[in-house]
Amino acid sequence: MDIKQLIGETTDYDKKVALETKKPKSWCKSISAFANCYGGRLVFGVANDDALVGLSDAEGDAEKISEIIKTHLNPIPEFELSFEKDKDKTFVIVEVMKGQQTPYYYEGDGQPVSYTHL
């Protein structure tokens, strides 16, 4: 998969410039929404203006992403992590499948919340 093609042609994705571990709600709500609707992809290393910035520790970030999803979402959605390279930059792509056990809740602020995409 070409990262430029993914961010340029699809609407079933969200992007984050970096992994936020202290405030995972900012991206876990996208994981919840994808699992509760039609599935989708969350791309780490892409800025809001679609600039390709990459991640400095993509493998370490991927491990943290997996751990955070497993500890903050209930039930745990089906997802796959992959890496994409563009020149000297590396990106982490979280592909979330359409859930079979909806609703999927984000549990991180004391009260479970379910999200959807419109």
Model-based region annotation:
Residues 1-118:
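Conserved N-terminal catalytic/coupling substructures associated with nucleotide/phosphate chemistry
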